[in-house]
Amino acid sequence: MFGNMKEMLKQAQNMKSQMKKIKKELESIEVEGISANGACKVTMTADMKTQNVEINETLLSSEAYVIENAIKVAVNNALEDAKDTSAKKLKAVTGGLT
């Protein structure tokens, strides 16, 4: 009984250590989201920190709602990619428990 408990604690500590490594790795992986027309590009890390936003100069002459929509689409695409990347990395550690 206590042997199982020791083994479970050991596994939990190992998983915690691996999770720290994954978290650090996610901080260095960059993903991009691009608007449908390519006029806006957002770069963020896989831990969902925005690194850069690029707006094509031709987009700047558009109406505000067009610019807003392009930024929204690019951000959402980058977030989706960051979530997918993060989930894949975490699944490798947790065995699909996430």
Task: Go through each PLM region and give its residues.
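Short, functionally important structural connectors and interaction interfaces within domains
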Residues: 1, 18, 47, 51-52, ...
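Stable alpha-helical structural segments in soluble proteins, enriched in small hydrophobic residues
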Residues: 70, 74-85
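Long amphipathic alpha-helical segments used for membrane anchoring, targeting, substrate engagement
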Residues: 1-28, 32, 81-98
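Residue-level signature of catalytic and energy-coupling elements of molecular machines
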Residues: 12, 48, 71
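A short, polar/charged loop-to-alpha-helix boundary motif
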Residues: 60-69
